[in-house]
Amino acid sequence: MSASSGDVHGAMVHSMQGMESEHMMSALPGSKSSFALSAIAADDPEPPTDFQLGSLTKEIKTANPETQALFDQGLRFYCAFNFRESYRAYKAALKRDPDCVMCRWGIAMSLGVNINQLDQPEQDRRIAQQMLRDALRIRDADPKERALVEALLPRYEAHRQIPDESERQNRRNKDYAGAMTALARRYPDDPDIQTLYADAVMNLRPWEYWDRQGNPAYHDIPPAVDAVEGGLKAHAEHMGLVHWYIHIREGSTEPNVVTPFADKLPDLAPGAGHLVHMPSHIYYRTGDHLKSFEANQKATLSDETYFKKVDAGPGGGIAHPDGDRYRWGYYRHNIHFALASAILTGNVEDMNWAADRLRRSEGEGVTFRTDRYRGVYYQSLPYFMSPGEILQQPPPDGTAKDWRYARISWDYAQVLAHVRKRDAGGARRAYVQLDKDVIAFRNERRDEVMGHQAAQIMQSVAHARIDQMNGDAQSGVRVLERSAGQQDAMNYDEPPYWMVPVRQTLAALLIDLGRYDNAIKVLHASLGNDDPNRDLYTSFKGNGWAYFGLTQAYERKGIENLTPGQREDYDGARKRLAEYCPPAGRACALSLDRM
């Protein structure tokens, strides 16, 4: 029998549940989703087909060339984490061949959870389950295709006997990972299945693959790494394998092993902004912040080209400010990452470009993400703007409750601007307001743990700089020593929730006090050079501010007084610094009062 193509969305197509989804990379790890993708994308027009997504293909059982082409487009978008585009490509493929087993499998895959969205909207779960059940009723299915459908089906079981929804989802994830583990052993030479197996394992505990020293956190991580690396030996240009390889390796002690593959990824799918961005996860971890910025700048421009294409397409595009996860999540993640990378180079032009792009990327109304990103914008200003320019920046408009994090960040930037102008009264007034806004933030949003930690850092840095301005840098040192420990306790996020090491500011105050050896030690700690077992989450490798601080400390100590080892360290810091701030060319913001 042939399964009816019918209405993919079913009777619940326009229902929406819960709060707005938060993309983990731009929000809190483990955040919950909101709107069912099948509802958001219900009225999306037929997809264009000229997205420059490369040549990844998986031959499926169909006699229709358009179905095959659209299936491949869905697979490429799935590998690029644009699940909405993946979903509409698979729907279009199924429309052309109602007997296509893999088209139904693809629809179900695109409606599932992923490492950046941990829950499963009930509407999406039901539609995915029905798609897979219908696929199993299709006669003469290819054995491997049927096996993929059977492996995916546990991901969408209802499990009504389990009272808690999060526990139901954990059970689904575990059962799916078990099924994909078995399938990966059955088809060891299929790169798509190896990718899906690694993805299933990673979804068991998203972003918790390695401990804070870079060792595997769970027993199932090494086999997943082996599967991806084995697949890459024969399929080095498989965009899915490379994408998941970056994610599964970035938190390890050896992110550099991914670099040769990461370097090639943007050219494999130049029209997929998220894949153009992905190498920066490795470049950032290995301390190559110029390349990290460049990757994210290119990714941002790639996404903007994509938006123009879909917005100009049939039906007027797919921009839905109420829940388009890609546009309001992944796109702005590129810009955030570009800004975080640019800050660590001290490049004024790059920081200005990214900060301006981030500010102009708003447009969905005030949400958690909007508040967070406006806060990031304000936090960046002291690194490249003059005090006068910062003081001219208006605070967020609208209700204070909507902008708690952004308002704290604005207060913080105001304090530092007044300090640099040596305006003690202005700094004190801004700090009093900062304190008030931090208290309100804690009282109203108790669950935003990392936001509270970042707010505490802003208080500490502002307090220390005021102490320094008032001639009591030693008091500021004590404040920052405590704050550095608090930053060490923050969870992994990429880029880090607080974009620079507190230790660089601590070093600036130590240099001011003439404690050059202490400053050098602190700066090496910020770079992760002091201890090979240092917590990977607390290291900012390749940070230009640290190299600048090292050169300042050594020069004030007296070049003629350096030991051979110190001279070697000084020369190395100058060499790295020259990469970010060459004698002629880029405008460089690196200075002790900005650190």
Model regions and ranges:
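Feature representing long, continuous alpha-helical segments
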Residues: 388, 412, 425, 432, ...
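N-terminal alpha-helical interaction modules that lie
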Residues: 2-245, 253-255, 263, 267-269, ...
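Catalytic cores of extracellular degradative/oxidative enzymes
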Residues: 262-263, 270, 274, 280-285, ...
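Residue register of alpha-helical TPR repeats
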Residues: 68, 102, 150, 240, ...
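C-terminal non-catalytic interaction modules
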Residues: 521, 525-527, 531-595
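Carbohydrate-binding/catalytic loop surfaces
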Residues: 315-329, 375-379, 450-459, 504
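Phosphate/diphosphate-binding loops
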Residues: 308, 335
